[in-house]
Design a protein with these regions (language model features):
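Single conserved hydrophobic/aromatic residue that forms the stacking wall/gate
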Residues: 216-226
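Alpha-to-beta junction loops
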Residues: 90-91, 108-116, 163-164, 201-210
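Extracytoplasmic/secreted cell-surface and envelope-processing proteins
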Residues: 103-104, 123-125, 151-152, 174-178, ...
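Acidic, polar ligand-binding/catalytic clefts
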Residues: 82, 91-158
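Short, low-complexity disordered leader/linker segments with a strong preference
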Residues: 1-36
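Bilobed "Venus flytrap"/periplasmic-binding protein-like clamshell domains
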Residues: 43-46, 70-86, 118, 140-192, ...
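Extracytoplasmic small-molecule ligand-binding "clamshell" domains
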Residues: 34-118
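Extracellular/periplasmic Venus flytrap/periplasmic-binding protein
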Residues: 188-190, 197-203
């Protein structure tokens, strides 16, 4: 049984620079007169977006070739971006960008939009335009199944334990570390996979992340984490 120690709902949206509108952005493709919608993804955040070697998905659909890196991108957000591009009559271009710098690229005009689990915050709202939310997710704390924390059901039980906490760099998850009493700030990582690996290797005691991401990213969530 997985313990949902942090039960907080946040929303995810498409994000564009305030200097651009989705219907007004884009450039002409070099191969056709069709306009291009450039969207950046982390491409390492399953099930929302990930990288694979071939375009084959297995459901009759096709993954999208990544413009600035090897491989193809697919996932819920990639499919959603493709539908938006299709509705606008644009060609979709996918860019693979590390999370820690993805919003900076949006600001400098490297691409038109970001769709990679970006959550609304008042601070981000000062710089970026957010679409209507397309997903609500639950933030949880995940620990090793064989750790002393595995049977905890309340955050108050962590008081005085000096629990080492990790999450993704520069995300809205970071402030939730303060919700764990007596938590010790451990190293944060670029990807969710690295966060889970830190818990598996006992470099950290708990990762704070999205519950759905846990189901897809944890090496073996049913057996190893709670």
């Amino acid at each position: 049984m997985k313990k949902k120690l942090l039960s907080l709902m946040v929303i995810m949206s498409l994000v564009v620079s305030m200097t651009l509108g989705v219907t007004g952005c884009g450039s002409k493709s070099s191969d056709s007169d069709k306009k291009v919608l450039k969207v950046a993804f982390e491409c390492a955040y399953a099930p929302y977006n990930w990288t694979q070697e071939s375009p084959e998905v297995g459901n009759g659909k096709q993954a999208v070739k990544i413009k600035n890196a090897d491989g193809y991108a697919y996932g819920y957000e990639v499919e959603l971006a493709q539908r938006i591009a299709d509705e606008l009559g644009y060609e979709l271009e996918v860019y693979k960008i590390e999370w820690s710098s993805i919003l900076m690229g949006l600001q400098d005009g490297s691409y038109d939009a970001v769709m990679t689990g970006v959550c609304y915050s008042p601070e981000r709202d000062e710089t970026y335009d957010f679409s209507t939310p397309y997903y609500k997710r639950q933030i949880v704390g995940v620990v090793r199944a064989d750790s002393e924390y595995a049977n905890y059901t309340k955050l108050s039980q962590f008081a005085g334990k000096n629990t080492k906490l990790t999450t993704q760099i520069a995300t809205n998850y970071v402030p939730y570390k303060d919700e764990v009493p007596g938590g010790v700030i451990a190293t944060d990582y670029e990807t969710s996979s690295e966060c889970f690996l830190a818990v598996q290797n006992k470099t950290a005691d708990m990762v704070i992340l999205d519950y759905t991401c846990l189901l897809y990213t944890s090496p073996s969530p049913r057996d190893r984490t709670r």
